[in-house]
A protein has these predicted regions:
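Active-site and adjacent substrate-binding regions of carbohydrate-active enzymes
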Residues: 1-366
Length: 366
Protein backbone atom coordinates (compact mmCIF):
# COMPACT_ATOMS: atom_id res chain seq x y z
CA UNK A 1 0.00 0.00 0.00
CA UNK A 2 1.44 3.36 -1.03
CA UNK A 3 2.13 5.66 1.91
CA UNK A 4 0.30 9.01 1.79
CA UNK A 5 0.38 12.17 3.89
CA UNK A 6 -2.83 11.41 5.79
CA UNK A 7 -2.15 7.81 6.86
CA UNK A 8 -0.82 8.71 10.31
CA UNK A 9 -3.24 11.56 11.02
CA UNK A 10 -6.01 11.85 13.62
CA UNK A 11 -9.23 13.49 12.44
CA UNK A 12 -11.87 15.26 14.53
CA UNK A 13 -15.33 16.34 13.41
CA UNK A 14 -16.57 19.76 14.49
CA UNK A 15 -20.25 20.61 14.31
CA UNK A 16 -19.75 24.39 14.17
CA UNK A 17 -23.24 25.35 15.28
CA UNK A 18 -22.73 23.92 18.76
CA UNK A 19 -18.94 24.08 19.12
CA UNK A 20 -18.16 27.53 20.56
CA UNK A 21 -20.11 30.79 20.34
CA UNK A 22 -17.91 33.90 20.65
CA UNK A 23 -20.42 36.66 19.87
CA UNK A 24 -23.29 35.70 22.16
CA UNK A 25 -25.88 34.88 19.49
CA UNK A 26 -26.24 31.28 20.64
CA UNK A 27 -24.60 29.83 17.53
CA UNK A 28 -21.06 28.51 17.33
CA UNK A 29 -18.82 30.32 14.88
CA UNK A 30 -15.48 30.31 13.06
CA UNK A 31 -13.91 32.54 15.70
CA UNK A 32 -14.74 29.87 18.26
CA UNK A 33 -12.97 27.20 16.21
CA UNK A 34 -9.92 29.41 15.68
CA UNK A 35 -9.69 30.08 19.41
CA UNK A 36 -9.53 26.34 20.16
CA UNK A 37 -6.89 25.29 17.62
CA UNK A 38 -4.13 25.13 20.23
CA UNK A 39 -6.33 22.98 22.46
CA UNK A 40 -7.19 20.64 19.58
CA UNK A 41 -3.54 20.40 18.63
CA UNK A 42 -2.68 19.51 22.22
CA UNK A 43 -5.25 16.70 22.05
CA UNK A 44 -3.38 15.26 19.07
CA UNK A 45 -5.79 16.34 16.34
CA UNK A 46 -4.30 16.72 12.86
CA UNK A 47 -7.34 16.99 10.59
CA UNK A 48 -10.48 18.97 11.40
CA UNK A 49 -13.64 18.08 9.50
CA UNK A 50 -16.17 20.93 9.50
CA UNK A 51 -19.84 20.11 9.08
CA UNK A 52 -21.47 22.47 6.54
CA UNK A 53 -20.75 26.18 6.93
CA UNK A 54 -21.93 27.25 3.47
CA UNK A 55 -24.77 29.72 2.96
CA UNK A 56 -27.99 27.81 3.57
CA UNK A 57 -31.63 28.13 4.72
CA UNK A 58 -30.72 25.35 7.22
CA UNK A 59 -33.73 23.18 6.51
CA UNK A 60 -31.36 20.22 6.94
CA UNK A 61 -28.66 21.68 9.20
CA UNK A 62 -26.70 23.17 6.31
CA UNK A 63 -26.86 20.13 4.03
CA UNK A 64 -29.14 22.25 1.85
CA UNK A 65 -26.65 24.65 0.26
CA UNK A 66 -27.89 27.81 -1.44
CA UNK A 67 -24.44 29.18 -2.35
CA UNK A 68 -21.39 26.92 -2.58
CA UNK A 69 -19.04 29.92 -2.67
CA UNK A 70 -20.27 31.71 0.46
CA UNK A 71 -19.95 31.22 4.22
CA UNK A 72 -23.22 31.35 6.18
CA UNK A 73 -23.26 34.62 8.09
CA UNK A 74 -24.31 32.71 11.22
CA UNK A 75 -20.78 31.27 11.31
CA UNK A 76 -18.76 34.25 10.15
CA UNK A 77 -17.13 35.51 6.97
CA UNK A 78 -14.92 34.20 4.19
CA UNK A 79 -12.07 36.27 5.65
CA UNK A 80 -12.47 34.44 8.96
CA UNK A 81 -12.49 31.11 7.17
CA UNK A 82 -9.26 32.03 5.39
CA UNK A 83 -7.83 32.98 8.79
CA UNK A 84 -8.81 29.53 10.09
CA UNK A 85 -6.96 27.91 7.20
CA UNK A 86 -3.87 30.03 7.85
CA UNK A 87 -3.87 29.42 11.61
CA UNK A 88 -4.35 25.68 11.11
CA UNK A 89 -1.43 25.60 8.67
CA UNK A 90 0.83 27.29 11.25
CA UNK A 91 0.11 24.35 13.56
CA UNK A 92 0.58 21.68 10.87
CA UNK A 93 -3.14 20.99 10.95
CA UNK A 94 -5.49 20.42 8.03
CA UNK A 95 -9.07 21.54 7.40
CA UNK A 96 -11.58 19.50 5.41
CA UNK A 97 -15.20 20.42 4.77
CA UNK A 98 -18.43 18.64 4.04
CA UNK A 99 -19.10 18.45 0.31
CA UNK A 100 -22.80 18.15 -0.50
CA UNK A 101 -23.17 17.59 -4.24
CA UNK A 102 -25.96 15.04 -4.63
CA UNK A 103 -28.39 17.88 -4.07
CA UNK A 104 -28.55 21.58 -3.27
CA UNK A 105 -31.09 23.92 -1.67
CA UNK A 106 -34.27 24.89 -3.48
CA UNK A 107 -33.08 28.45 -2.80
CA UNK A 108 -29.95 27.96 -4.93
CA UNK A 109 -29.92 30.19 -8.01
CA UNK A 110 -29.74 27.14 -10.29
CA UNK A 111 -33.02 25.78 -9.00
CA UNK A 112 -34.69 29.17 -8.95
CA UNK A 113 -33.75 29.62 -12.61
CA UNK A 114 -35.03 26.11 -13.36
CA UNK A 115 -38.41 26.90 -11.80
CA UNK A 116 -38.60 30.18 -13.72
CA UNK A 117 -37.97 28.40 -17.04
CA UNK A 118 -38.81 24.66 -16.84
CA UNK A 119 -37.72 24.20 -20.46
CA UNK A 120 -34.50 26.17 -20.11
CA UNK A 121 -30.84 25.31 -19.53
CA UNK A 122 -31.03 25.10 -15.74
CA UNK A 123 -33.96 22.70 -15.72
CA UNK A 124 -31.49 20.08 -16.93
CA UNK A 125 -29.40 20.66 -13.80
CA UNK A 126 -32.15 18.74 -11.98
CA UNK A 127 -34.69 15.98 -12.64
CA UNK A 128 -38.06 17.25 -13.85
CA UNK A 129 -40.64 14.75 -15.05
CA UNK A 130 -44.33 14.83 -15.92
CA UNK A 131 -46.72 13.07 -13.60
CA UNK A 132 -48.74 9.98 -14.49
CA UNK A 133 -52.52 10.38 -14.52
CA UNK A 134 -52.37 13.05 -11.86
CA UNK A 135 -49.90 11.10 -9.73
CA UNK A 136 -46.12 11.42 -9.23
CA UNK A 137 -43.86 9.92 -11.94
CA UNK A 138 -42.92 6.95 -9.72
CA UNK A 139 -43.46 5.55 -6.25
CA UNK A 140 -40.11 6.26 -4.57
CA UNK A 141 -39.96 7.12 -0.88
CA UNK A 142 -37.38 9.71 0.13
CA UNK A 143 -34.89 9.09 2.93
CA UNK A 144 -36.84 11.61 5.00
CA UNK A 145 -40.23 10.03 4.24
CA UNK A 146 -42.91 10.86 1.71
CA UNK A 147 -42.67 10.71 -2.06
CA UNK A 148 -39.41 11.70 -3.77
CA UNK A 149 -41.39 13.68 -6.34
CA UNK A 150 -42.57 17.18 -5.45
CA UNK A 151 -45.12 18.90 -7.72
CA UNK A 152 -44.07 22.13 -9.42
CA UNK A 153 -46.77 24.74 -8.73
CA UNK A 154 -48.79 25.66 -11.81
CA UNK A 155 -47.35 22.79 -13.84
CA UNK A 156 -47.93 19.14 -14.63
CA UNK A 157 -44.29 18.43 -13.73
CA UNK A 158 -42.56 17.19 -10.61
CA UNK A 159 -38.96 17.50 -9.44
CA UNK A 160 -36.98 14.71 -7.77
CA UNK A 161 -35.47 14.81 -4.27
CA UNK A 162 -34.07 11.88 -2.29
CA UNK A 163 -33.92 13.91 0.93
CA UNK A 164 -36.15 16.87 1.92
CA UNK A 165 -38.35 18.54 -0.68
CA UNK A 166 -36.18 21.62 -0.18
CA UNK A 167 -33.17 19.61 -1.42
CA UNK A 168 -33.64 18.93 -5.16
CA UNK A 169 -31.24 16.33 -6.55
CA UNK A 170 -28.62 17.50 -9.04
CA UNK A 171 -28.48 15.85 -12.47
CA UNK A 172 -25.01 14.34 -12.72
CA UNK A 173 -25.70 13.13 -16.25
CA UNK A 174 -25.44 16.77 -17.38
CA UNK A 175 -21.80 17.66 -18.24
CA UNK A 176 -22.48 21.37 -17.66
CA UNK A 177 -23.59 20.62 -14.11
CA UNK A 178 -20.49 18.51 -13.51
CA UNK A 179 -18.26 21.33 -14.78
CA UNK A 180 -19.91 23.73 -12.32
CA UNK A 181 -19.33 21.29 -9.46
CA UNK A 182 -15.69 20.64 -10.40
CA UNK A 183 -14.97 24.36 -10.70
CA UNK A 184 -16.37 24.94 -7.21
CA UNK A 185 -14.40 22.07 -5.65
CA UNK A 186 -11.13 23.26 -7.17
CA UNK A 187 -11.86 26.80 -5.98
CA UNK A 188 -11.97 25.57 -2.38
CA UNK A 189 -8.89 23.39 -2.79
CA UNK A 190 -6.99 26.34 -4.24
CA UNK A 191 -7.80 28.25 -1.06
CA UNK A 192 -5.85 25.67 0.90
CA UNK A 193 -8.53 23.20 1.93
CA UNK A 194 -7.01 19.73 2.44
CA UNK A 195 -10.01 17.77 1.23
CA UNK A 196 -13.62 16.84 1.82
CA UNK A 197 -15.99 14.49 3.54
CA UNK A 198 -18.36 13.77 0.65
CA UNK A 199 -21.99 13.52 1.67
CA UNK A 200 -24.44 10.98 0.20
CA UNK A 201 -22.23 10.62 -2.87
CA UNK A 202 -23.37 7.12 -3.79
CA UNK A 203 -26.79 8.59 -4.66
CA UNK A 204 -25.62 10.64 -7.65
CA UNK A 205 -26.32 7.88 -10.19
CA UNK A 206 -30.01 7.51 -11.01
CA UNK A 207 -32.05 5.18 -13.20
CA UNK A 208 -33.30 7.85 -15.58
CA UNK A 209 -36.40 5.79 -16.38
CA UNK A 210 -37.40 6.05 -12.69
CA UNK A 211 -39.46 2.83 -12.92
CA UNK A 212 -42.02 1.98 -10.26
CA UNK A 213 -40.89 -0.64 -7.74
CA UNK A 214 -42.70 -3.08 -5.51
CA UNK A 215 -43.87 -1.15 -2.42
CA UNK A 216 -42.04 -1.99 0.80
CA UNK A 217 -44.24 -0.08 3.24
CA UNK A 218 -47.84 0.63 4.18
CA UNK A 219 -47.63 3.96 2.34
CA UNK A 220 -47.47 2.20 -1.02
CA UNK A 221 -43.99 3.55 -1.67
CA UNK A 222 -40.61 1.90 -2.22
CA UNK A 223 -37.36 3.12 -0.69
CA UNK A 224 -35.36 5.24 -3.12
CA UNK A 225 -32.28 3.36 -1.92
CA UNK A 226 -33.43 0.35 -3.93
CA UNK A 227 -32.98 2.33 -7.14
CA UNK A 228 -29.44 3.25 -6.06
CA UNK A 229 -28.66 -0.40 -5.31
CA UNK A 230 -29.84 -1.59 -8.71
CA UNK A 231 -28.47 1.07 -11.06
CA UNK A 232 -25.05 0.77 -12.71
CA UNK A 233 -22.58 3.45 -13.74
CA UNK A 234 -21.72 5.30 -10.53
CA UNK A 235 -18.04 4.32 -10.85
CA UNK A 236 -17.63 6.32 -14.05
CA UNK A 237 -19.07 9.42 -12.40
CA UNK A 238 -16.91 9.03 -9.29
CA UNK A 239 -13.77 8.53 -11.35
CA UNK A 240 -14.54 11.62 -13.41
CA UNK A 241 -15.05 13.59 -10.20
CA UNK A 242 -11.72 12.42 -8.77
CA UNK A 243 -9.70 13.04 -11.91
CA UNK A 244 -11.01 16.58 -12.37
CA UNK A 245 -10.54 17.61 -8.73
CA UNK A 246 -9.10 15.57 -5.85
CA UNK A 247 -6.36 13.72 -7.73
CA UNK A 248 -4.87 16.96 -9.05
CA UNK A 249 -4.52 18.38 -5.52
CA UNK A 250 -3.57 15.25 -3.53
CA UNK A 251 -6.70 15.92 -1.49
CA UNK A 252 -7.90 13.71 1.37
CA UNK A 253 -11.43 12.44 0.75
CA UNK A 254 -13.88 10.45 2.86
CA UNK A 255 -16.86 9.08 0.97
CA UNK A 256 -20.19 8.49 2.68
CA UNK A 257 -20.81 5.17 0.95
CA UNK A 258 -23.16 2.37 1.99
CA UNK A 259 -23.29 -1.36 1.27
CA UNK A 260 -20.18 -1.79 -0.83
CA UNK A 261 -19.31 -5.41 -1.58
CA UNK A 262 -15.83 -6.77 -0.95
CA UNK A 263 -15.28 -7.09 -4.70
CA UNK A 264 -15.90 -3.34 -5.12
CA UNK A 265 -13.56 -2.13 -2.36
CA UNK A 266 -10.49 -1.69 -4.62
CA UNK A 267 -12.51 0.62 -6.87
CA UNK A 268 -13.48 2.77 -3.91
CA UNK A 269 -10.46 2.75 -1.57
CA UNK A 270 -7.69 0.91 -3.41
CA UNK A 271 -4.46 2.67 -4.36
CA UNK A 272 -6.23 4.20 -7.35
CA UNK A 273 -9.70 4.22 -5.79
CA UNK A 274 -12.33 6.92 -6.01
CA UNK A 275 -11.67 8.09 -2.42
CA UNK A 276 -8.92 8.10 0.17
CA UNK A 277 -11.23 6.23 2.52
CA UNK A 278 -14.90 5.54 3.13
CA UNK A 279 -16.98 5.23 6.25
CA UNK A 280 -17.86 1.74 7.42
CA UNK A 281 -21.38 1.58 8.83
CA UNK A 282 -21.57 -2.16 9.56
CA UNK A 283 -21.28 -1.82 13.36
CA UNK A 284 -23.29 1.37 13.30
CA UNK A 285 -26.26 -0.32 11.63
CA UNK A 286 -26.60 -2.76 14.52
CA UNK A 287 -28.31 0.05 16.44
CA UNK A 288 -30.66 1.08 13.65
CA UNK A 289 -34.19 0.57 14.95
CA UNK A 290 -37.43 0.40 12.99
CA UNK A 291 -37.77 4.17 13.22
CA UNK A 292 -34.07 5.01 13.04
CA UNK A 293 -31.51 5.71 15.73
CA UNK A 294 -33.96 6.94 18.37
CA UNK A 295 -35.50 3.53 19.04
CA UNK A 296 -32.24 1.61 18.78
CA UNK A 297 -32.41 -2.00 19.99
CA UNK A 298 -30.00 -3.25 22.67
CA UNK A 299 -26.51 -3.80 21.25
CA UNK A 300 -24.65 -7.07 21.73
CA UNK A 301 -20.99 -6.30 22.42
CA UNK A 302 -19.93 -9.51 20.67
CA UNK A 303 -21.90 -8.57 17.54
CA UNK A 304 -20.48 -5.03 17.63
CA UNK A 305 -16.92 -6.29 18.04
CA UNK A 306 -17.37 -8.82 15.24
CA UNK A 307 -18.76 -6.20 12.86
CA UNK A 308 -15.76 -3.92 13.38
CA UNK A 309 -13.23 -6.75 13.24
CA UNK A 310 -14.76 -8.18 10.07
CA UNK A 311 -14.80 -4.78 8.38
CA UNK A 312 -11.12 -4.22 9.10
CA UNK A 313 -10.10 -7.71 8.04
CA UNK A 314 -11.79 -7.34 4.66
CA UNK A 315 -9.92 -4.12 3.83
CA UNK A 316 -6.49 -4.83 5.32
CA UNK A 317 -4.94 -5.60 1.93
CA UNK A 318 -6.97 -3.01 0.03
CA UNK A 319 -7.05 0.35 1.78
CA UNK A 320 -8.50 2.26 4.70
CA UNK A 321 -12.03 2.19 6.11
CA UNK A 322 -13.24 4.46 8.92
CA UNK A 323 -15.45 2.73 11.47
CA UNK A 324 -18.33 4.80 12.83
CA UNK A 325 -19.22 5.11 16.49
CA UNK A 326 -21.41 8.18 16.11
CA UNK A 327 -21.88 11.19 13.86
CA UNK A 328 -24.16 14.18 13.41
CA UNK A 329 -27.14 12.13 12.18
CA UNK A 330 -28.16 10.51 15.45
CA UNK A 331 -27.90 10.71 19.27
CA UNK A 332 -24.56 10.63 21.06
CA UNK A 333 -22.77 7.32 21.33
CA UNK A 334 -22.93 7.39 25.13
CA UNK A 335 -26.72 7.40 24.87
CA UNK A 336 -26.59 4.13 22.95
CA UNK A 337 -23.71 2.35 24.66
CA UNK A 338 -24.53 3.22 28.28
CA UNK A 339 -27.76 2.67 30.23
CA UNK A 340 -29.37 5.78 31.70
CA UNK A 341 -28.05 5.16 35.22
CA UNK A 342 -24.46 5.00 33.95
CA UNK A 343 -24.53 8.23 31.95
CA UNK A 344 -22.33 10.32 34.20
CA UNK A 345 -18.98 12.05 33.75
CA UNK A 346 -16.88 9.13 35.03
CA UNK A 347 -18.57 6.62 32.75
CA UNK A 348 -18.19 8.99 29.80
CA UNK A 349 -14.44 9.12 30.42
CA UNK A 350 -14.23 5.34 30.73
CA UNK A 351 -16.09 4.67 27.49
CA UNK A 352 -13.90 7.21 25.68
CA UNK A 353 -10.84 5.37 26.97
CA UNK A 354 -12.31 2.08 25.85
CA UNK A 355 -12.96 3.49 22.42
CA UNK A 356 -9.40 4.70 22.09
CA UNK A 357 -7.96 1.33 23.05
CA UNK A 358 -10.40 -0.51 20.86
CA UNK A 359 -9.67 1.79 17.94
CA UNK A 360 -5.93 1.23 18.28
CA UNK A 361 -6.31 -2.53 18.14
CA UNK A 362 -9.07 -2.84 15.58
CA UNK A 363 -9.29 0.36 13.57
CA UNK A 364 -5.83 1.77 12.99
CA UNK A 365 -4.20 -0.12 10.10
CA UNK A 366 -0.54 -0.29 9.17
Amino acid sequence: MKRTWWHDKVAYQIYPKSFLDTNGDGIGDLRGIISKLDYLKELGIDIIWLSPIYKSPFVDQGYDISDYYAIAEEFGTMEQFEELLAEAKKRDMYIIMDLVINHCSDQHKWFQKALADPEGEYADYFYFRKGKNGNPPSNYRSYFGGNCWEPVPGSDKYYFHMFAKEQPDLNWENPKLREEIYRMINWWLDKGLAGFRIDAIINIKKDLAFPDMEPDGDDGLASCWRMVENVEGVDALLEDLKNHTFAKKDAFTVGEVFNIGVEDLPDFIGENGHFSTIFDFSAHMLSDGKHGWYDAPPISFDAWKKAITDSQMRVQNVGFEANIIENHDEPRGVSRFLPDYAQNALQHIQICGFRLNFAWVYIIIG
